[in-house]
Amino acid sequence: MTQDQTAEQMPAAESADQSADQGPAAESAAPPAVDSERIKELEAEIAKLKNDVLYAKAETENTRRRLEQQAEDRGRYAISNIAKDVLSVADNLRRALDSVPASAREGNESLTALTTGVEMTERELLATFERYGIKLVAAQGERFDPNLHQAMMEMEDPSQIEGTVVLVMQAGYTLHDRLLRPALVGVAKGGPKSGGNNVDTKV
């Protein structure tokens, strides 16, 4: 073999050696086959975890709002028990005024002064009630409302629409949007009928 032929064969041999060396490396660089079923399982698990996180967030927010509402209610209605006790004071003032007819006041300065003082006390007490969210329940002349009124009797009155409150025996009160005490009332019957609530006169 001549020197030139030997030189021509050497690059070919080196190229073959390099290909042989790169063969295993090229094969190891290829990405492993991934199980498509496993991918689906992982995707399902991720979706479930996302839903669980969203649910937990919603529950946390609902709990926070509920606690805030409870705290607000405790503040708004903390005086409920005291208010119910004080209502009897307003009742007694009203009874005292109702027991003195206007005719008895005429010509009696002492009695007039006394009733005027009681009226002022009543107005001041009701104004104090208002400041704390305690309000009188509208009753006289109103349509009977079982949510606000308690019917104690029915009164024959053809001139009034049936179910109209024609007598207030005891005032009712609300505290903000809650009923402290229903108004005890008498309601008309025998007059024109109007669609609405049926009146239950049972105590």
Swiss-Prot record:
Top-level lineage group: Bacteria
A GO-annotated cellular component: cytoplasm
Region described as Disordered: 1-38
Coiled coil: none
InterPro entries: GrpE, GrpE_coiled_coil, GrpE_head
SUPFAM superfamilies per the UniProt record, alphabetical: Coiled-coil domain of nucleotide exchange factor GrpE, Head domain of nucleotide exchange factor GrpE
Keyword Transcription: no
Gene Ontology terms, MF aspect: adenyl-nucleotide exchange factor activity; protein homodimerization activity; protein-folding chaperone binding; unfolded protein binding
Localization (cell): Cytoplasm
Keywords tagged on the record: Chaperone, Cytoplasm, Stress response
Main location per the UniProt record: cytoplasm
Keyword Signal assigned: no
GO biological process, one term: protein folding
Annotated family: Belongs to the GrpE family.
Subunit structure and binding partners: Homodimer.
Family matches, as HAMAP family: GrpE
NCBIfam families named in the record: PRK14140.1 (NF010738), PRK14141.1 (NF010739)
Role according to the record: Participates actively in the response to hyperosmotic and heat shock by preventing the aggregation of stress-denatured proteins, in association with DnaK and GrpE. It is the nucleotide exchange factor for DnaK and may function as a thermosensor. Unfolded proteins bind initially to DnaJ; upon interaction with the DnaJ-bound protein, DnaK hydrolyzes its bound ATP, resulting in the formation of a stable complex. GrpE releases ADP from DnaK; ATP binding to DnaK triggers the release of the substrate protein, thus completing the reaction cycle.
Name this protein carries in UniProt: Protein GrpE
Species of the source: Paramagnetospirillum magneticum (strain ATCC 700264 / AMB-1) (Magnetospirillum magneticum)
Gene: grpE
